[in-house]
Amino acid sequence: NERKQFKTPISDFGAIKVKLAKMATDTYAGESATYRAAKNIEDRIAMREAAGNTHQEAELKGVEEYAIECSILKVAVSEDVQNCADEGIQIFGGMGFSEETPMESAWRDARIARIYEGTNEINRMLSVGMLVKKAMKGHVDLLGPATAVANELMGIPSFETPDYSELFSEEKAMIAKLKKVFLMVAGSAVQKFGPDLEQHQQLLIAAADILIEIYMAESAILRTEKNVKRTSEKEQSAQIAM
């Protein structure tokens, strides 16, 4: 509220509100996905320890089983942080590019996150590549659902009007459609290129972007649903809006 234009705090302008809302939404989605993956890993470690593995063995296997989710989070969260820092500079205006303001160091610190711990390009390709390898080894059924989606597209579409009266029903329907898109892309790619798929980096990166959007959006919805049941829709109104 310190910066003003036409005697009005810039935080009152719609263009600035959109930027702040996008930052808050991306942060919430990233936080939700991180909590989700961390809980899944924690549960898997406990399950393996109960099965007789040492703690070290359980940790290694537990994290390994959720390596895809970890790659997704590394890409999504590092890019969200970068976008927040970038928009922060935009909000500060010319001052934001100066070392005297906090945004200059925030942007520089955020930028390196897309490079270390495996570049985001590598992590994108890894996320889809690992999923495809699991499918080819029979650990995950990818081709079955992909074939079902292809058959569905060849069939007669439903002309019924969906009921979106239930909370998040429309958002869940959108995620379900995104999953079908991913299955079509990934399934077709596996059928066409097989083991050589890893050579087609552009395709892997494009498929990874779909996978990332699915995981982040679904995580935010799952968290909000849980909190609505724990409290109320009124108390979670901001999170629902996100």
Please place each PLM-identified region on the residue numbering.
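Flavin-dependent oxidoreductase catalytic core characteristic
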Residues: N1-M242
